[in-house]
Each structure stands twice: as C-alpha cells, then as structure tokens.
Amino acid sequence: MAEAKEENREKNEEEESVKLFVGQIPKHMSESQLLTLFQEFAVVDEVNIIKDKITRASRGCCFLLCPSREEADKLVNACHNKKTLPGANSLLQVKYADGELERLEHKLFVGMLPKNVSEAEVQSLFSKYGTIKDLQILRGAQQTSKGCAFLKYETKEQAVSAMESINGKHKMEGSTVPLVVKWADTERERHTRRLQKAQSHIARLGNGDPTNPSLFGALPMGYVPPYNGYGYHQPPGTYGYMLPPIQNQAAFSNMIAQPNQGNNNALQGTSPDSVPPRLARRNFPMPPGNYMGSGYPAMRGHPFPFAYPRGIVSPRPLSSSPGSISPGMSTPLGIGLSSVVQTEGPEGANLFIYNIPREFGDQELAAAFQSFGIVLSAKVFVDKATGVSKCFGFVSYDSQAAAQNAIDMMNGRHLGGKKLKVQLKRDSNNGQPSSNPSLIS
C-alpha cells in the first residue's frame, strides 16, 4: 500500500502542476481551512489567498495548486458555479489562472525557418519526437512565410525532447543558421514585451532631440533655480515673445534696465533681426528665464541669457504644430518639420495603418515603424473640429522592402492595447497602390 502511494506521488511530481483561480470565497476563511475543503473534491497541494497589499486582508479570492491537469479538471467540474462556501453569498468561480491553458498546450515557437519551407517538411522533422496536434507557419499579407512557426505536441515530454534535439543544432536544407526552438510566449509575456517595447519607443522620443534633455521638457540636470533674491528678469512688455519691428528698436532696448552690469559684452541691445535663426522662428510658451549669475552663456547680441530655449511642460515651441516631428528627430527619421505636407515614398513603399492607439500622434507613429527602414513621413489623421485622432494614418518608406518588412512584422500586432491593421496604401478609385494618394480629412 505504501509503495503504491509512493509510486503515485512520483508520477504526480513528474507531471506539471496546474494553477487555478478561485473567486467568491469568504474573506474570514484561512488557507488551511480552504485547503481542507477543496481536498474533498480533488488533490490540492497548496492554497494562496490573494490579499490587499496595504491591509493584508483577504480579497475574497485565491490560487490553488493542483499536481496535474486531471486533478485541476476534477476540481473545476465539481465546484465551478456549483458550490457555495459557508458564509458566502455567491457560487464559487473556479477556472484556470491566466496563461495556464496556453502553458499546458505544450506550444513551441520555431524560428529561423527557410522562407520557402513547407508545412510538410516541418511536420516531417518534428514528428520524430512525438505526436503533433497543430502546426502553423506564420505568413505575411502576401502569403509569404515569415520564417517562423508554432506547433503543439500532445505531451510536455515530447516538446522538451524536440527542443533539446533541435534548438541551435539542426539546420534545414537551404538555411545557413540552425533552428531556434523554444516555448511559445503566453499572453501575459506578450503583453509585458509590448509594454517594454512601448517604453523603449518613448525613451527614444525623449532622446531624439539633442536640445531636449527629457521627454517632458524638464530642465537639464544640475540646473539651480534662481533663489538669490533677483529671480527671472525679462524686458518689460515683451514676456519672452518676439516683438514686431518698430522704429528705433535699439533705443527701445537701451531703455530697459540691463542685468549683470559687470558683463558689458553680454549686454548689447537686441532686435528681432539679431536673434540667431534657430531661435528667431520660435515663440516661447513661457518667458525664457534669466537670473543673476546664470550658468548659461549669454547669446551674442542679446541682453538676456536663456536658461532653456523651450517650454517647461511641452518640448515643442508654440510655433510648431502638435503633429510635427521635433527638429532633432528629423535626421534619424528623415521627417520634415511640416505636418501638412505628406512626403510620399516610391510605389509600393507607402502604408495605410488602421487601429492606431488614440493617444498616438505623428511622432509616436514614426517611432513605432522606424525600426523597419527609413521613414520618409508619418501622418495620423485627426478630426478637424475636435482635434481627436481618427485612429488611422499613413507611413511612407524609402523602399518597398522596408514597407513589406513593416507589414510582415506589424500587421496583426498589438500596440497600446489595439490590434494594428497594416497594408499597402491603395488608390480608392481602382484598388491599386497609389503614387499620389489624396489625404483623407
């Protein structure tokens, strides 16, 4: 009898444990009480009550750990929507925890497949290690292989055997690199990776402009506010905005009290024509600061050294449109400052993107697609009346290969919680790729 129990225990340990989520449990019940109760229906190894992070009180739900899928199914069938625990008002909700069913499917990802490989060839290779329940080669919009596939085995042991035998060791005919075989990501892992990718895009946006030290226009590190009693100083009546040309401008400037009298070289009169071109085209969202003993060098021909030539909240000056790309990003992305003119790529290199996250603008759209090639332009369309995104737009590349690569990798992918639809831009008249598409208002 003891030997039989030991045999069963060893068998269970070899099988993979399964996590279940249970809702509608009384908040006063302890883990030991719940364990005893659920063990009446199936073998349960562990109970973990989900508690409030601050009060540490039960939230009325828990996780159960069963030694096998068979035991987990027994518990689900016996309790889900069928049992009510003492002190509870609703039926128990028992289901597999998030990601468990995917994990239990023994699903493998196979990468570095030759583009011309057939499903029969993949089936022939992997069927040596067990029974394949499902096999799918991923294909793009033109039904061309993406060089990867998903397959499912009947048992975990078969999947492990295939991984150990093929991953990094086997090269298929026509390929110079070995296959990559690993466990397929669960939905939770895919969601985490999407978040990390979105964060990296945001980080690149923040570092794209050399004059913008941070994404939100924060002042440079080491900046010390002017707490010396003098504070910021601006010419009366100007408040940091460019003045229209007036007669005797130099005399007007000389009437203004000049700070830092000890530094006469920095106290020259100014006019709009004397401001450097980089600054002359900007209207500042707030007064450019100046304070006594500024750590910033004075501008030639300007009496007030600028602490930071941009807005504190927005990294763009007011003269730029909300949808335009910042100057520092124009070089790596190849995108001009104007958000009105849509730069068109060659035929077959212009994409239509649908289901763009509502919070995305031109700049974010360009950043999301820049890893596939040189982006000539990116445009998100907005409602003229409300300024709210219509959730579709266009991206133009410098080559057809870059556009096709973007379609293969981004079509059907989730971005910001929305599933993208990416395809070649087409002429609405004849359904053919358009070389001069009309902009949709």
Curated annotation (Swiss-Prot):
Isomerase keyword on record: no
Tree of life domain: Eukaryota
Induction data: By abscisic acid (ABA).
Pfam families according to UniProt: RRM_1
Functional note: RNA-binding protein involved in the regulation of flowering time. Acts as a repressor of the activity of SOC1, a transcriptional activator of flowering time. Binds to the 3'-UTR of SOC1 mRNA in the cytoplasm and participates in SOC1 mRNA decay, mediated by the distal region of the SOC1 3'-UTR. Acts as a positive regulator of salicylic acid (SA)-mediated immunity. May act on SA signaling-related genes at a post-transcriptional level.
Organism: Arabidopsis thaliana
GO molecular function, one term: mRNA binding
Coiled coil residues, start to end: none
Domain RRM intervals: 18-99, 106-186, 349-427
Places the protein is found: Cytoplasm
Tissue: Highly expressed in stems and cauline leaves, and at lower levels in siliques, flowers, roots and rosette leaves.
Disruption of the gene: reported phenotype: No visible phenotype under normal growth conditions, but mutant plants show enhanced susceptibility to the pathogen Pseudomonas syringae pv. tomato DC3000.
Compositional bias segments (type: Polar residues): 258-273
Residue ranges of the region described as Disordered: 258-282
Name the UniProt record assigns to this protein: RNA-binding protein BRN1
Keywords tagged on the record: Cytoplasm, Flowering, Plant defense, Repeat, Ribonucleoprotein, RNA-binding
Record GO biological process: flower development; mRNA catabolic process; plant-type hypersensitive response; positive regulation of salicylic acid mediated signaling pathway; regulation of photoperiodism, flowering
Matches recorded under CDD domains: RRM1_2_CELF1-6_like (cd12361), RRM3_CELF1-6 (cd12362)
A GO CC term attached to the entry: cytosol
